């Protein structure tokens, strides 16, 4: 074989095995949340007791989505611009397949539409999960070993597939939290942005990262990592194109959201920076044990995050 030989054949190719594993894991994830599917509006289901809670159908029923109307003008939504678009898309698909989405919809019709809406969202999130898996497979260890490049530094051959993809497709977090909300979509956009950056496509990488940040501000941490790496390597022209594209896309998304529903957009900002302590955080544990409230938790968390990132950047420069 030799140390530089590259084994070939289906048994040495992680691609089909990763896709097959992703399908199995996602089917198990869907099966895990089936006890929370409510079929009769008169028979409530306790998702906490059954440990299969999801924001997706809950928000559909509680926010009035089932009665129609623009989601950007609905203050009960208060989601990021990208997530709001995804919610509107899933509801449109449900309506196109015959679900009753109108002010005349009964509670049972809203429940039926919510279940169908959840099914459409599961498909959308599965596509995002596949995008994450494929991106990691083309970014993992050995994916760019000895690849020839052109005069611009772009590889002239396809990247090799890495077995590191199984760290993602077999991750327990996917099984436990993959269907809680639409968070998988910003993750997919962020990972595909990294792949575009690795293929020397700064404009495309910036556009994808801007969309990812429009779906979740946590994606900005990845953009900050790219910023630090470019400053270390003095790749300023590529960094400029990357940041310009990402900033423009992010600003355009928020401007459109504000124009379509200023109150909803402002409610989202308030929930991000001025909301109370949320479930599943260390702040909730502190608040619950002390019996008091923590004011300005969003600003405290943001300040600690920015300070930590600046500290890491200073250590890596």
Task: For every predicted segment, state its role.
Residues 1-153:
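TM-lumen/periplasm interface segments of multi-pass membrane proteins
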Residues 38-49, 53, 255-285:
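Extracytoplasmic catalytic-loop and juxtamembrane helix elements of membrane-embedded
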Residues 130, 151, 278-317:
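Aromatic/glycine/proline-enriched transmembrane-helix motif characteristic
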Residues 135, 185-202:
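Specific aromatic-rich, kink-prone transmembrane helix
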Residues 137-144, 148, 153-155, 159-173, ...:
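Transmembrane and membrane-interface helices of multi-pass
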Residues 173-174, 203-227, 252:
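Membrane-interface alpha helices of multi-pass inner-membrane proteins
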Residues 178-186:
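Short acidic/glycine- and proline-prone juxtamembrane loop motifs at membrane-interface regions
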Residues 221-248:
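Perimembrane helix-loop-helix junctions
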């Amino acid at each position: 074989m030799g140390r530089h030989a590259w084994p070939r054949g289906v048994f040495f190719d992680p691609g089909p095995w990763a896709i097959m594993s992703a399908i199995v894991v996602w089917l198990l994830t869907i099966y895990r949340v089936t006890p929370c599917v409510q079929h009769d509006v008169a028979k409530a289901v306790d998702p906490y007791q059954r440990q299969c809670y999801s924001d997706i159908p809950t928000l559909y029923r509680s926010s009035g989505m089932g009665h129609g109307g623009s989601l950007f003008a609905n203050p009960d939504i208060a989601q990021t611009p990208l997530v709001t678009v995804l919610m509107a898309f899933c509801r449109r698909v449900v309506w196109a397949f015959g679900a009753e989405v109108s002010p005349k919809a009964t509670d049972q019709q809203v429940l039926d539409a919510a279940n169908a809406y959840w099914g459409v969202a599961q498909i959308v999130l599965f596509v995002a999960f596949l995008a994450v898996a494929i991106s990691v497979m083309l970014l993992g260890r050995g994916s760019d070993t000895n690849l020839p490049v052109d005069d611009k530094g772009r590889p002239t051959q396809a990247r090799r597939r890495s077995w590191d993809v199984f760290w993602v497709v077999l991750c327990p977090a996917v099984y436990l939290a993959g269907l809680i909300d639409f968070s998988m979509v910003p993750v997919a956009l962020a990972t595909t942005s990294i792949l575009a950056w690795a293929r020397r496509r700064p404009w495309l990488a910036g556009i994808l990262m801007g969309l990812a940040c429009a779906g979740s501000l946590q994606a900005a941490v990845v953009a900050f990592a790219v910023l630090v790496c470019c400053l270390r390597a003095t790749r300023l022209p590529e960094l400029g194109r990357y940041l310009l594209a990402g900033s423009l896309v992010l600003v355009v998304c928020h401007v459109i959201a504000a124009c379509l529903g200023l109150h909803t957009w402002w409610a989202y900002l308030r929930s991000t920076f001025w909301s109370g302590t949320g479930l599943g955080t260390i702040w909730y544990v502190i608040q619950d044990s002390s019996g008091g409230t923590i004011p300005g938790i969003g600003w405290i968390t943001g300040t600690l995050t920015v300070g930590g990132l600046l500290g890491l950047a200073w250590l890596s420069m």
